[in-house]
Amino acid sequence: MKITVLGCGALGQLWLSALCKHGHDVQGWLRVPQPYCSVNLIDTDGSFFNESLTANDPDFLAKSELLLVTLKAWQVSDAVRTLASTLPVTSPILLIHNGMGTIEELQSIQQPMLMGAITHAARRDGNIIIHVANGTTHIGPAREQDGDYSYLAEILQGVLPDVAWHNNIRAEMWRKLAVNCVINPLTALWNCPNGELRHHTDEINAICEEVAAVIEREGYHTSADDLCYYVEQVIDSTAENISSMLQDVRAMRHTEIDYITGYLLKRARVHGLAVPENSRLFEMVKRKESEYERSGTGMPRPW
């Protein structure tokens, strides 16, 4: 399959290496155009992938059968709109990022839109990406008109298992959002690995109660207890991980808070729900961001 991977960070390189190893025809797409992108990855089994792959080739993009987007949430809309005019109108666009809200920004895109949530863990160590832990990628149609692309899940299952197709992906996206609303802001504010959150069950419960109320209003059945149990499972299984938001804060980069807690706050307002704990955490992360963005280091760059 001919695939363009938009974004060549940790997640992008994980997909590029896996697709390449399994015989797919792939290219990367970088914000600053370059003819090649270096992919240096150590997999969970210790094997090493080190290759320069084609990048930013518009002719390749014009023949691509899939655009796999692994950017930060706040980069997605501008980048996808830029590339959509060259991508075949029948080729699906699969968004894999933390948070929600990008689909609402891309309603006018003609290509089929799919969205996904991933639990694989990968991190950068210098110039090398380390695939820390295997996980599952959940994918499904982003809009009602986007149809059944379950064959893609089968193809990607053979590349980077596990991959699960959901006819209604939004329920799974909300579950992932609940996890992100707990783990990302708390670890970013407390500067700790995920496992440290085990000692803060009251805080986790307060966040999950608010998220559960919003999810119920969105039309998906859940409970605060169910969400807490799920979040605590994720905390245990990723105890040594440094969350993506904490990595961003440590590197003084723009975070995805607007698409995680920020998205929850938007939907809560629509439903007339008060979410004071999530509001407080949102403001604290935004304040931390503004401290280093004022100095110019972490300003979000245009795509």
Curated annotation (Swiss-Prot):
Q: Where in the cell is it found?
A: Cytoplasm
Metabolic or biological pathway: Cofactor biosynthesis; (R)-pantothenate biosynthesis; (R)-pantoate from 3-methyl-2-oxobutanoate: step 2/2
For this chain's UniProt record, which GO biological process terms are given?
A: pantothenate biosynthetic process
The molecular function terms in GO held by this entry are: 2-dehydropantoate 2-reductase activity; NADP binding
| Main localization, broad class | cytoplasm
Q: May I have one GO cellular component term? A: cytoplasm
- An example of a Pfam family matching this protein is ApbA
Give the annotated active site.
Answer: 176 (proton donor)
Keyword Calcium applies: no
* Claim: Oxidoreductase is one of the keywords in the record: yes
As its record notes, the protein acts as a catalyst of: (R)-pantoate + NADP(+) = 2-dehydropantoate + NADPH + H(+)
Residues where substrate binds: 98, 180, 184, 194, 244
Q: What is its EC number?
A: 1.1.1.169
Give disulfide pairs as residue numbers: none
Q: Where does NADP(+) bind?
A: 7-12, 98, 122, 256
Q: Which UniProt keywords apply?
A: Cytoplasm, NADP, Oxidoreductase, Pantothenate biosynthesis
The protein's superkingdom reads Bacteria
What is annotated about its quaternary structure and interactions?
Monomer.
- State its role: Catalyzes the NADPH-dependent reduction of ketopantoate into pantoic acid.
Question: What's this protein's family per the entry?
Answer: Belongs to the ketopantoate reductase family.
Write the protein's name: 2-dehydropantoate 2-reductase
What are the leading ranks of the lineage? Bacteria, Pseudomonadati, Pseudomonadota, Gammaproteobacteria, Enterobacterales
